[in-house]
From Swiss-Prot:
Gene, per the UniProt record: rplN
Source organism of this protein record: Thermotoga maritima (strain ATCC 43589 / DSM 3109 / JCM 10099 / NBRC 100826 / MSB8)
Name recorded for this polypeptide: Large ribosomal subunit protein uL14
Gene Ontology CC terms: cytosolic large ribosomal subunit
Stored HAMAP family: Ribosomal_uL14
Function, as annotated: Binds to 23S rRNA. Forms part of two intersubunit bridges in the 70S ribosome.
Length: 122
């Protein structure tokens, strides 16, 4: 359950380290985001000399949440942190590597490039 003002870790090598959510995209007054949702964020921490600077407004897709996700077969999955991957306006990842596992729900939402770069898909 990612909402406005939530801090997210960045799970790629785009140069950002921490993001703060400004808005969850989709629907009218959508309050909460989960795995596969696109969010507009502000970069709160960044690596020096990187493409992304502190204060930049970026789009990201949520790849991990601490709040469990119920799947159609009745199982639940949750992760140790809230994490996102920075994307461009074509929904392609801005980084070239993904760190840590990502949820299988990303495949159903059409983020195949992120799924293929990830070391593990749960």
């Amino acid at each position: 359950m990612i909402q406005q003002e939530t801090y997210l870790n960045v799970a790629d090598n785009s140069g950002a380290k921490k993001l703060r959510v400004i808005r969850v995209i989709g629907g009218f007054h959508k309050k909460y985001g989960t795995v596969g949702d696109i969010v507009v964020c502000s970069v709160r921490e960044a690596i020096p000399n990187s493409d992304v600077k502190k204060g930049d407004v970026v789009r990201a897709v949520i790849v991990r949440t601490k709040k469990e996700i119920r799947r159609n077969d009745g199982t639940y999955i949750r992760f140790d942190d809230n994490a996102a991957v920075l994307i461009d306006k074509f929904n392609a990842p801005r980084g070239t590597r993904i760190f840590g596992p990502v949820a299988r729900e990303l495949r159903e939402k059409g983020f195949m490039k992120i799924v293929s770069l990830a070391p593990e898909v749960w």
